[in-house]
UniProtKB/Swiss-Prot annotation:
GO terms for molecular function: ATP binding; tryptophan-tRNA ligase activity. ATP binds at Q9, S10, T11, G17, N18, G149, K150, D151, I189, K198, M199, S200, K201, S202. Its main location: cytoplasm. One of its GO terms (biological process) is tryptophanyl-tRNA aminoacylation. The gene is trpS. This is Tryptophan--tRNA ligase. Catalyzes the attachment of tryptophan to tRNA(Trp). Gene3D superfamilies: HUPs, Tyrosyl-Transfer RNA Synthetase. L-tryptophan binds at D137.
Length: 335
């Protein structure tokens, strides 16, 4: 049995990319592994946010987790902010990281450029040290595997580097070195309008993003209007047919069909027929998720389970934070 750790930010609404890149992985892994899955609300305050929206989004994300099939009794699912050891270890890790390596993080460069697009906005320090909190999220639990999308791979590699660095400095196996878990398909779903960029809740043009709580008729419209090409041939070729390849990835993830099977299925068929099948598969999934979501969001069941899991989690991580503090000469944590 492996220990697996991962989480998703509680900003805006989760997307089909979040589901296929992360949530579906969690569901597949939860039966045979020990899983710590958190709603990353502390990561959500690294950029400008509205407190009332954040509070609502936290519960929304938790309800979507449950609606998608994550078991709150089998897994330890919790709010990141409910376990203070995350931020405590994050500070310690920040003290063992370097300005240069944090400056090289691609996500920091991209997000800081967007934040300061007009040249007058200050860049939050939290955005710069985001990878340190992510490293703490992982190393705190001695994770064996961490399911991440391709865009988080660099942060994951940094977490490994810092763990190795601290183990070497203190001449002890303070942290387990985690491995990346990345599924072959679905780790990165692209935008429907611009398949050169990742499908994201923060993209300016929402026509390219499918949100899990979108109306199904809107979802179908987005898929039918998705960018393809003039070849009118369903073929997996990311370089020459990025739009079609992206739709094939989505269809593959939802039907468990390989790309060559999909190519054969739609041989001599036009893009309209192909898009209709993709839309059918996506809408079937979303109808089921949304029905269950309403039940969970409008009850107190999830909040009660999150509170119970946070207590369980704190008991586990306090042992780890004590070990870290003692190793650094900081004494025993009394929290």
């Amino acid at each position: 049995m492996k220990t697996i750790v991962s989480g998703i930010q509680s900003t805006n609404s989760l997307t089909l990319g979040n589901y296929l890149g992360a949530l579906k992985n969690f569901i597949n892994l939860q039966n045979d592994n020990k899983m710590f899955i958190f709603i990353a609300d502390m990561h959500s305050i690294t950029v400008d946010f509205n407190p009332k929206e954040l509070e609502s989004n936290r519960k929304s994300v938790a309800s979507i987790y449950a609606a998608c099939g994550l078991d709150f009794d089998k897994n330890i699912i919790f709010y990141q902010s409910s376990v203070l050891a995350h931020t405590q270890l994050s500070y310690i890790i920040t003290c063992h990281s370097y300005m240069g390596e944090l400056s090289r993080m691609t996500q920091f460069k991209d997000k800081s450029q967007k934040t300061n697009a007009n040249g007058t906005t200050n860049i939050p320090t939290g955005l710069f040290i985001y990878p340190c909190l992510m490293a703490a999220d992982i190393l705190l639990y001695d994770a064996d595997l961490v399911p991440v999308g391709k865009d988080q791979k660099q942060h994951m590699e940094l977490a490994r580097d810092i763990a190795i660095r601290m183990n070497k400095k203190y001449k002890t196996n303070l942290f387990k070195i985690p491995e990346i878990y990345q599924s072959e398909m679905g780790a990165k779903i692209m935008d429907l309008v611009d398949p050169s960029i990742k499908m994201s809740k923060s993209n300016a043009n929402t026509k390219g993003t499918i949100f899990l709580l979108d109306k199904v008729e809107d979802v179908r419209k987005k898929i039918m209007q998705a960018k393809t090409d003039s070849l009118n041939k369903v073929k997996y070729d990311v370089e020459n047919q990025p739009g079609v390849s992206n739709l094939m990835t989505i269809y593959s993830c939802l039907t468990n069909k390989k790309t060559d099977e999909i190519e054969k299925e739609f041989e001599n068929k036009n893009y309209g027929e192909f898009k209709t099948k993709v839309a059918d598969a996506v809408c079937l999934l979303l109808e089921d998720i949304q029905k269950k979501y309403q039940i969970y969001f409008n009850s107190n069941e999830i909040e009660q389970k999150l509170e119970k899991n946070a207590k369980k989690c704190n008991e586990i991580v306090n042992k780890k934070i004590n070990l870290v503090q003692q190793t650094l000469g900081l004494g025993t944590y009394k929290g």
